[in-house]
Amino acid sequence: NFTEITAKAVLFPDYQDVTIPANIAPLNFMITDSSATEYVVHFQSKAPSSDQLLAGGGEDGKIMIDSTQWRNLLTASKGQKIVASVYANRPSGWVKFKDYSLHVAEEPIDPYLSYRLIEPGYELYRQLGLYQRNLTNWDVHTIYENNRTYEEKNNHCINCHNYKNYSTQDMLFHVR
């Protein structure tokens, strides 16, 4: 038993009503509701197969989605939408927030993203690196790191990196 409310659940990151690629890794998130002690999220495909997935979370609001079930749901839902229903257990009982949708694109996303990771307020040449993230499973691999620890006389900066003609076959980065 639950009471339906008209408010949307507050999610971080907010994935509500967006289009996602069919091969994206599970979009785990947090629900912020100061009075709830547990959560359930029901993902229901609107594709003819009507696949579904349940995910739950405790008082911290963290919703961790099973990767195999997520992949199966997205594969079955290409070009369709998935409706997500969020339930929260409050002291007054279970409530159901307003549903939201995820539209699943038929096209896959390129699996890798490369980026330079630096500290906020970066001032010294230390702990700076180039990394590659797999967007289909969230694995991260190091391309290059200047130092794992600060060394006063042995530091160098890693500057911009780019790909020749936007192709992933050749990459260039500058170290000084």
Per-range role (PLM):
Residues 1-176:
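Sequence signature of WD/YWTD-type beta-propeller architectures
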